[in-house]
Amino acid sequence: HEKGLVDCEAPLREFLAVMERLGDKLGPILAQFAYVAKGKDANEYATGASFRERLAPFLALWPKERPLAVEVRNATWIAPPLLDLLKERGIPLALSAYYTMPAPEKLFAGPDPRTAELTYVRFIGDHKKMDALVARLSRKGARASDWGALAVDKAPEMRRWAGVLKSAARGPALAYCNNHYAGFAPDSARSFRDLWDKVPS
């Protein structure tokens, strides 16, 4: 997102050429876009219109055989204009457990965020809050290392995500976890997998 999706055809070709070296290990590629603050651009904060204008030609460049997911961090952008753009191309909107984004129940109460067969979810968390918590616990000697164990219990939230997503999934589902979500990404991933398996099909 550093180039703002402008004049990125050559860098995109180079990037994809490198990624293809991963072969069968390469999964869907995530295009992550930053939050736009209201104070920076009130209209863009509310609508994402400029972002969509730049996103459409970028998606036209993207090879159909290479799976892509698109992540935004403005909740107001999860609306028909963006959803329809992604749906036309069969590209999943990445669903995010992030402090600027809606909880799963609220997310699915609005326009249907499913834009493809693939469900793609990211457990991101709040970087500033988690950094502060981990630093505080480390100073107290409550952690052997900064990111070696869970710092908070996110099981109730993940259980809600699992229930909503499993009932809404149209095909395969992929979940990715960040250390900043609960303090240790591998344990968060294991926890979500276990919770997912307990949700009735």
Task: Specify the residue positions occupied by each region the protein language model found.
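Residues lining hydrophobic/aromatic ligand-binding pockets adjacent to catalytic sites
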Residues: 1-201
